[in-house]
Structures are given as C-alpha cells and as structure tokens.
Amino acid sequence: MKKANRSAGSVPKVSGISKPQTVEKSKPENSSSAPTGVKPVRPGAAAALSKTKSNDDLLAGMAGGVNVTNGIKAKKSTCSSAAPSAPAPAMTISENKSKISTGTSSSAKRSTSAGNKESSSTRERLRERTRLNQSKKLPSVSQGANDVALAKRSRSRTAAEGDIRMSKSKSDNQISDKAALEAKVKDLLTLAKTKDVEILHLRNELRDMRAQLGISEDHCEGEDRSEVKETIIAHQPTDVESTLLQLQEQNTAIREELNQLKNENRMLKDRLNALGFSLEQRLDNSEKLFGYQSLSPEITPGNQSDGGGTLTSSVEGSAPGSVEDLLSQDENTLMDHQHSNSMDNLDSECSEVYQPLTSSDDALDAPSSSESEGVPSIERSRKGSSGNASEVSVACLTERIHQMEENQHSTSEELQATLQELADLQQITQELNSENERLGEEKVILMESLCQQSDKLEHFGRQIEYFRSLLDEHHISYVIDEDVKSGRYMELEQRYMDLAENARFEREQLLGVQQHLSNTLKMAEQDNKEAQEMIGALKERSHHMERIIESEQKGKAALAATLEEYKATVASDQIEMNRLKAQLENEKQKVAELYSIHNSGDKSDIQDLLESVRLDKEKAETLASSLQEDLAHTRNDANRLQDTIAKVEDEYRAFQEEAKKQIEDLNMTLEKLRSELEEKDTERSDMKETIFELEDEVEQHRAVKLHDNLIISDLENTVKKLQDQKHDMEREIKTLHRRLREESAEWRQFQADLQTAVVIANDIKSEAQEEIGDLKRRLHEAQEKNEKLTKELEEIKSRKQEEERGRVYNYMNAVERDLAALRQGMGLSRRSSTSSEPTPTVKTLIKSFDSASQVPNAAAAAIPRTPLSPSPMKTPPAAAVSPMQRHSISGPISTSKPLTALSDKRSNYGELPVQEHLLRTSSTSRPASLPRVPAMESAKTISVSRRSSEEMKRDISASEGASPASLMAMGTTSPQLSLSSSPTASVTPSTRSRIREERKDPLSALAREYGGSKRNALLKWCQKKTEGYQNIDITNFSSSWNDGLAFCALLHTYLPAHIPYQELNSQDKKRNFTLAFQAAESVGIKSTLDINEMARTERPDWQNVMLYVTAIYKYFET
C-alpha cells in the first residue's frame, strides 16, 4: 500500500473548515455562532449526542458509581478551546474516552471484588458462629455412654444446622447476584435498542445525502453514474460546492457519532467481559490482531504512548487483539496520516473498508474513509473529480452501516440467548436450593439415626463382650461355621442364576409375543372404532324414534281438540232441537185452540189462520228435518273420530312399548360396548407396559451389541499382535539362515586351512555337522510351527467370517425389526423417563450403562474408521445410507462375532498352541453369560474392565519371549479377569446425574466443552462442522442460515448421499431448504421450519433456527 504526502497548504484548510465544524457540533449550545458558509447543526445530531452522553452516564453508574461528569466537562472544555488547532481536539477526545473506559472498567472490577469480599466475610462469620456454638455445647457433655450419645447428637444437629444456614446464605447470594446480572443485561438490551434507533437515523441521513447529491441507487456503479455526475458538476459548479460542504458537515457528524458508538460498544464489551460473556469467539485473537495490523502498519512511538491508557485497560479486560487495541491503533493511524492527500491513499482506505469483517466490533474499528476526505474533496471538486470521492465515501458509509447493523443483530441475538440461559439457570438454582434444603433435612434425620445406630452398636458390642466372657468362664467352645456360610452363598448364587435364566426366557417370550400384541392392539383399536360407529348409529336411531313419538303426540293432541269441537257442536245442536220441540208443542197447542175457535167462530178467518199455520208448520218441519240430518251427520262424524282416536291410541301404545323395548336393547348394547371398551383400554395399557419392557430389552440388546463390538476390537488387536509375532519369527528364521551360511563358510575355511590335522579336522567336522543338524532341526521345527500358525490363523479367519456373516446378519435384522416396531413408543418412554426421577430400577441402570458406554473413546478408537462412517462405534441409520454405502458398511459389520459363538470356544486351554491360546485368552475378556445376566451384575462388573484388559495386554507383550508353560499359567488366570471385565468404566452417581442432565439438555455438555453460553457453544460447533465448505460463514442463527447452504453443509457431513453439495447454489433457496429438510426427515428429525417463510425472509427467527440445529446436534452427537 503506497502512502503519499499531502501538501502543507492543505493543513490550515483542514483546521479552518473541518475541525471547527466538529467543535461546533460537539457543542450544541453554541450552534448559533457558526461561521459563514457552514450550515448550523441539525437537531438530530444534537439529540444523538445527548443520548450517547446519557448512555455514558448510565454505564458509569452501572459499573460502580464512578462520577464521570468531570471527564465530560473536561471533554467539552478541551473541544471548545481547541478550535484553531487541528490535531488537538481529536487527541483530547480520544484521551478522555480512554480515561472514561479505564475508569468504568476499574470501577467495575472494584465493585465485583468488593462483592466477593463481602460474600467471603459473611461466610467466615457464619463459620465462626457455628464453631462458637459447637465450643459452647461441647463442655456440657457429661460422662457415660448416654452422655456421649447425647453429645454426638448435638454435634450432628449443630453441624447440620450450620450447613443448612450456609446453603441458604449461598442460595440467597446467588439469587441476588442473578437478579443484579439480569438487571444489567436488561439495561444493555435497552442500550442496544437505542443503538438500533441511531443506526436507522444514520441510514435516513444517508438517504437524504443521496437525494441531495442526485445519486440514484439503481445507477451507483458503472460509467453512466460518473457521466451523469460530471454533467451535473459541469452545469452547476456552485451547487456542487454547497452540497459537498453539506456532505462534509454530515460526514463529520457521522464520524463523531461513530466514535461515540465505538466508545459505548467498548464499554458494553468491558461490562460483558466482567459478567463472563465474550463477543470475540468468532475469530481467533491472533488472526484479528494480524488483520488489523495490516490496516494500520505505520504507528509511531509517540502515538502509541498516547493510547497507552486504552491499551492497559484492554489488557485488563480482554485478550490481545481485542477492541481496545484496535481502537488505539485506529486513532493512531488517523493522527499519523492526516498529512497525506493522494488519491492512492483514498482508494487504499476504501478497499480496506470493503474487506470482510466478522466480529461484532470490526465494523466500528475499521478506519473511516471520511476523515481523509475533508479538504482534498474541495480541491477535487474545483478540479472536477470531487464526485467520485463523495460516491466512494457514501459507498463506504453504506457498507459500514450495513456491517454495523448485522453485528448489532448478532449482539442482540446473543444477549437474548444469554437472558434465556440466565432465566433457566435461575430456575435450576431455585430447584437446587430446594433440593439442598431437602437433603439437609434428610441429613439431619440420617445423622440422628446414625447416632442411634452407633449407640445400639456400642450396646450390642458390650453385650457380645459380656457373653464371650461368660462362655470363656464356662469353657464353652464357639466356632463360626464358614462352610454353612459358603453353602448359603452358593445357594443364593444358584438361585440368582436360575432367576437370570428365567428372566432370559421371559424376555425371549416377550420378544416373540410382541408382534402378536401389536396385532391384537390393532384389532382392538379396529373393534373400538366399529363399536363407536355402532353406538353412533344406535343413538341416531333413538333420536329418530323420539322424533316420531313427538309427532304422534302432536297428532293425538290435534285429534283431541277436534273431538272437543265436535262435542261442543253436538251439544249446541241438541239444545236447538229441544227448543224446536218446545216450539212445536206450542204450535200444536195453538192449532188445537184454532180448531176449537174454528169450530166455534168464523170459518174464513180460521181458514186464513190455518193456512198461515200450515205454512209455518211446513217450514218448521223442513227445518226440523234438516236439523235431524245435521244431527245424524255430526253423530256419525263423532263416532268415526272416536274410532280413529281409539286406533291411534292403540298404535301409540304399541309404538311406545316397541320404543321402550328398543331403548332397553340399546342400553344393554351400550353397557356391553362400554365394558368392552374398558377391557380394550386395560389391554392397551397392558400392551403399553409390555412395549416399555420390550424397549428396555432392546436397550439391553444395544448394550450387548456394544460389548460385542468392543470384544471384536480386542480380537482384532490380538490378530495384529499375532501378525507381529509372525513377522518376528520370520526375522528369526532369516537370521538363522544367515547364521547357517556364516557357519558353513567358516567350516569350509577351517577345512581348507586345517587339512594337515586330520583328527582335529574330523572332530571339528563332526561337531559342525552336529551343530548344522541341530540348526536344521530347529529350522524345520520353526517352519512347521510357522505353517501351523498360518493355517490356524486362516482357519480362524474363515470360521469367524462364515459364522459371523450368518449370525450377525440375522441378529441385526431381528434387532432392526424390533426397533422399527417399537420406534413409535420410544418418544413416550423417553418423555416418561425424563418427566420424573425414577428409583434405580433395571431400566435406569441399563440406560445409564448405555449412555456411560458412549463416553470413553479409548476403546472405540481401536476400530478402524471408514470414510463413510461418521463416528466410531456408530452405524448410520438405514435411511441415511445409500446402497453403495450399505455395501461398504456390511463388510465391517459382518466381521463382528456374537457372544454365543465366542463363548462356545472357551474350551480346554491345554490342547491349544501358544498363539491360539493368546487369541482365546483375549477373547475371554468378556463374560460369556452377559445376555443372561441382568443390568445389576453388569453394573457391578463394569469397574475393572479397562484395567484388566490393559494388564492382560501388558502381560501378553511381556510374555512373548517366555516359555509356553508361563503362557499356559497366564491363560489359566485370564478367565478370572474376564469374569469381571466390561467395555465401560464405573458409573458413579455424579456421571449418572450428568448423563441425565445431558439427556434433558443436550447443549450443556457442548457448553462445558467449548466454554461460554450454550448459544455460542452451538455456534462454534456449527463453525467447526462446516469448516472447508465454500460460501459458508456462520456468525449467528438468523442471517447466516437464510439461503439454506449452512443446513446443507451441516447435514452433508453426516448424510453425504442425500445432499449433492457441489451442485447447490445460494440463489436457489427453496431447493436448498427442501434438500436439507428432506435429508433430516429421512433419519427421523422432524422439520419445525417453514420452507416458504425461510426462503422469503432475509433474517429468520433465530430461536426457531437454533432449536432445529439443536435437534440435529442431539440426533447425531448424543
């Protein structure tokens, strides 16, 4: 990088134009006295400055109550007094910021150290109190056995009470510390939100600048933009100068705000370092230091001494190469290169800014290009080239703001994850405190019972001594019958073996009955479904009958109403008929009177009257006949209605009886179905219990399989040792050949030289011939032994391969079928096992044995890994392996020998040669009856496994040159070791609790391995797994996963046959997500993310992404 010197004439212009503007912007109360040609300070910048000052005060108060207002006032006074000079304001501001940062960091350390001292002092006081109580209570102990027991009880109670008080005080201190930490983290989150608001404000100002300059975002690159800018500058030179002045003003304001953001970020980072969290885990410290030294290679000693305060504070608070070092280097480079004004300097600085920055502080620490563009931009604008400089500065600012926003999101994501972990830790702490209190109470109870038992023990001891003295006085002999005891032990052992045999037979029966139970369960579910359908149909039919009854009742009511109406009509007609009868009688009387009058009086008048009466009579008769007919009709209708009502009532009674019978039948059917459903439910619960037991058996089979694999590895090691012995014997044969040739040459030399001494020559010849015969015999014996060993080795290999291919293939198929049948119930058993802490049963011991056997990697490292096997002793599932991989994996699997095949070969050791005896000895380092022995015996014999196998290997290597008798003696002792050998180390309660914790939270072990929070540990694991993949840069759980390539790379490390990573493209997001999710679902990892939403959003929800990545880690790594 070339650096050119700037002209001396540019220095007063910088001091006259750019620096007074910065001073005026740092003092918003004097903004009215701005020089001519410079616009007054915007209210947004003043508000941002006041906000950052308030943030500084807040951080200073949080760090330890240090008053920082004096430093701020000093900063204001230095800025206002240094208006004529150019370098002075920048240096005073940087010094004041460094002082503030050192003050806050030192005050934070003082506060934390004071808190630690207070907590330690309270603990010492509590201990002294408990000691004083004990010392006060001890002298009051009287003599005698009862007094001694009382003293023991009082001591145990006081110790238990002291422990309870200590635990309570510790828990209270931890809760208060957690609350303080949560409050501080909440304050940090509020500050992060204010930073987001300030970044948005800066982006709005950048858009305003682009709008003022006339720069369109669609034409930010290319020759069209430069041509448009040149035409605008050519036509409007005065406007360009004014806009450039505004741009310089805004650049200085942005620079000040960025400096204050740097200071705040540094203080936040010190606070997080003090709290125990680190933001510099994405890059190595040496790489960051090297990268930033390349940005500022020329640093003078004077400037280094100016930034000494910052460097010392960074050494106290963080590692080398951290934010403080980089900030000090940045300020030094800015002070050192203020006198250079070439275009090469501008281009080089902009190219440095465009370099990729991954840390949360890199974007803030990159050297700002706007600082070197004050006065040269004015000169270039007068010369016609200022447009390019402004465009470059705008692009640099855009890039830096984008990087700041990305880092801010990562920081907020990490803070949210930290808050969640703090809440979880607080809950765990409360649970542990309650558990600690409960254990303290139990400890007090146990101490009391221990004191009682010790008193009883002393009492019984005195009684035993008394009885022994009585026996000695009366000369009565007493002997402990060891034979009876050993017989009792043998009887218990035999009963135990019988129980183990019965358990094995029951397990086999359960495995055989499992398919039948599953079929029965399916049939029961189908019957239950049919019964439910029948119940629904019967209910529908009963509803239909009830509706018919209601309609019939309505018809009956209507008929009754009609009958009442007809009865009323008949009654009215009867009344009318009676009235007419009375009228008829009256008329008859009148007629009689008229006849009498006619007989006595005038006949003409009588004729008229008779005529009129006759007419009335006819009318009355017609009316009576019509009324008679109406009455007959109404009576007929009434009779017909009564008949109809009677029929309807008969039908209603019959229908009601039929409905009652049907309802009774339905109730009986419903009761039967309910009883059947209850029976089915009980059968289902029994089947679930049997399924759980079968799952336990499957886990035991897994343990046996792991044991077999470890023994196979030991056999392979033994074969390697035999091959080494074979090579050693071949070397011995070669040395014997060479020695034979040398001796024959010497013999010929002796024969040539000593022909004169015939007797001596004959003696020497006879001796040489005897030696040659001996050597030939030894050579022949060694060759026969070698051929015999090679034949036996080939026979062993062939038998092992032939037997294992059939047995292990059938065994693996049976286990895979069992696992496929029980896969649906695995989730329920895991939830039930993790929901509550069970008592130590066979199931929990088997699970702890299984999980503990995966911890040591020393035994698993003996098996050679293939390129397609992701981890040793772990076969990928059937869905995750391609056909070619299955073919390549079936070879190593076929070499594993089941337990029964190896246990059958434990025969007579005296009839075997040495090497085969060694092979059998190593093969017997496994208990032959392991499938028949429950998990309790396997847990007892676990502890001596590694030690016994290593001692046996050392004995074998030490006895290579020994005689066959010593090897036979070692062979007789090796089965005794093999009875107690096992592939895993002893399972202690602490390891059990850690395994249980890792099953509940799989990220706890990862956090212990990598350090820091669980989120950062998972992020480091993802970075480690995706090392070497192109276009992968994982720095968070949101934007780093938005194209799907990170998921594909992570799953490609485990499932290379499912993901063609070389064919993937970052633009085709939907295809990437589809491939990754399908590959994960093929092995049983359910997708919790939506493909369309992931492909649509640029920043997905980091919590959902982290949950999905945790599921991948849990499946493949735990």
Curated annotation (Swiss-Prot):
Calponin-homology (CH) domain: from which residue to which, for each copy? 1012-1117
Detail the disulphide connectivity of this chain as listed in its UniProt entry. Answer: none
UniProt GO BP: actin cytoskeleton organization; adherens junction organization; anterior neural tube closure; cell adhesion; cell division; cell migration; face morphogenesis; negative regulation of actin filament depolymerization
Amino acid composition bias (Polar residues), ranges on this chain: 93-117, 133-145, 294-304
User: What are the Basic and acidic residues biased-composition ranges?
Assistant: 120-131, 158-171, 947-957
Top-level taxonomic group: Eukaryota
Q: Which Gene3D superfamilies match?
A: Calponin-like domain (1.10.418.10)
What name has this protein been given in UniProt?
Cytospin-A
Quote the subcellular location field of this record: Cytoplasm, Cytoskeleton; Cytoplasm, Cytoskeleton, Spindle; Cell junction, Gap junction
Coiled coil (UniProt feature): 168-281, 395-450, 488-808
Q: What's an example GO cellular component term for this entry?
A: actin cytoskeleton
- Function recorded in the entry: Involved in cytokinesis and spindle organization. May play a role in actin cytoskeleton organization and microtubule stabilization and hence required for proper cell adhesion and migration.
Provide the leader sequence positions: none
Q: What is the lineage of its organism?
A: Eukaryota, Metazoa, Chordata, Craniata, Vertebrata
Name the PANTHER family on file.
Answer: CALPONIN HOMOLOGY DOMAIN-CONTAINING PROTEIN DDB_G0272472-RELATED, CYTOSPIN-A
The answer to whether keyword tRNA-binding applies is no
What CDD domains would the database entry show? CH_CYTS (cd21199)
Give the record's family classification. Belongs to the cytospin-A family.
Annotated region Disordered: the residues are 1-63, 75-176, 294-324, 359-391, 921-999
The record's section on InterPro entries has: CH_dom, CH_dom_sf, F-actin_Monoox_Mical
The species is Mus musculus (Mouse)
Q: How does it assemble?
A: May interact with both microtubules and actin cytoskeleton.
